[in-house]
Design a protein with these regions (language model features):
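Interhelical loop and helix-boundary elements at the membrane-water interface
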Residues: 1-80, 86-122, 128-162
Length: 162
């Protein structure tokens, strides 16, 4: 198991998934354009929802790429982690809309696993990650994300404690 790499990845996954929340707190709805453009899926429900924005994805990728450089990894690894974490988040949102859950609603597991598992799988060969590295990182991210969400809420960064 690569403990130092797991720590680096946890920091980067937290940056990737936390950046859109922090940016939204500081910028509000300014420069906030929904990725789905307000389109509805064949079921009549929003494709992704208004909280998934181009701004959030772009900032996530840029901040995660910069964070990777600062953490001693290649910037492009950070860009891939950020991009695929956002793809996982969009996948979760798509599934949540199909389940009838509104934007911002909680779906424990679905809110944490794709946005951590997908990027780790995408970088597994580049970073020589083992199945154990991936499993431990996803589990730690899951717990950490739940704790950070509560803290973000307590410090008024997030509107809900999840």
């Amino acid at each position: 198991m690569h403990l130092s790499l797991i720590l680096q990845l946890l920091v980067l996954l937290t940056l990737a998934n936390g950046t859109p929340v922090v940016i939204n707190r500081f910028l509000g709805r300014r420069l906030s354009y929904p990725i789905d453009g307000g389109v509805r899926f064949v079921d009549g429900k929003p494709l992704l929802g208004s909280s998934k924005t181009i701004r959030g994805v772009l900032f996530s990728v840029l901040v995660t790429a910069a964070g990777a450089s600062l953490a001693g990894l290649e910037w492009n690894v950070g860009a891939v982690l950020g991009s695929v974490a956002m793809a996982g988040d969009l996948f979760s949102s798509f599934l949540k809309r199909r389940m009838g859950l509104p934007a911002g609603s909680r779906a424990t597991g679905l809110d944490q696993v794709p946005e951590s598992l997908f990027p780790l799988l995408a970088c597994r060969h580049t970073l020589s990650l083992t199945a154990l590295d991936i499993a431990v990182t996803v589990a730690l991210f899951f717990v950490g994300e739940v704790v950070l969400s509560i803290l973000f809420y307590k410090f008024h960064v997030r509107e809900r404690p999840y």
